[in-house]
Amino acid sequence: MISYIQYIKLYLFIIISIFLNSFTITSFAHEIKPSIADFYYDDNYLNFEIRLNAELILSNIDASKITNTNSSPLTDIYDKYRLLDKTELENLFIEKWEEIKSNIEIKINNKFSKIDLVRIEIKDVTNFEISRDSLIYLKIVLNKNSEQFTFKWFKNYGPIILRENNELKIDDDLYTEYLQPGIESDQIFLRENNFRSALVS
């Protein structure tokens, strides 16, 4: 016959087990999606608008090897960042920007260029079961000799899609490239075919 004390211990054990299991279930499981880098340029600047997962980058999860945040041993760190409100996350990203910037390579005419962070916008997604997008806006100074550029970022940041925005081009002429993690883009020429086709009214 189970004594009263043994019964209490068993009861507490069951309660604690249920609590721990519930905690595990509520851990966020977010699919890792490719980032998207939209770029456009004029005579003075090359501009980027990159849609990414800021929590993923800040937590140092290697997105080149997994497709879900729960597959990483750093998932608890990711979850901690996901619980931050948008202002806290924006401030933290800005604080870490110098380190993040060192993992982004944009070369103009095959030479590394200075990248300026213009601003960051965190989407306000209150459902923690859903990953939230962040937008970072970058600019790189161009000059009259700037002919082409390449883009590459740290493989741990995962795959990224490069997309050109240019109202002077028809859709078929716009540059698009899917980059595997850590792979450098082809050379992208800044003023090649920089006009609308004569067939477009």
Language-model segments: residues:
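Bacterial N-terminal signal peptides that target proteins for export
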Residues: 2-12
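Intrinsically disordered, low-complexity segments enriched in polar/charged small residues
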Residues: 11-14, 35
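Cleavable N-terminal signal peptides
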Residues: 15-17, 27
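N-terminal soluble domains immediately following signal/targeting peptides that reside
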Residues: 28-200
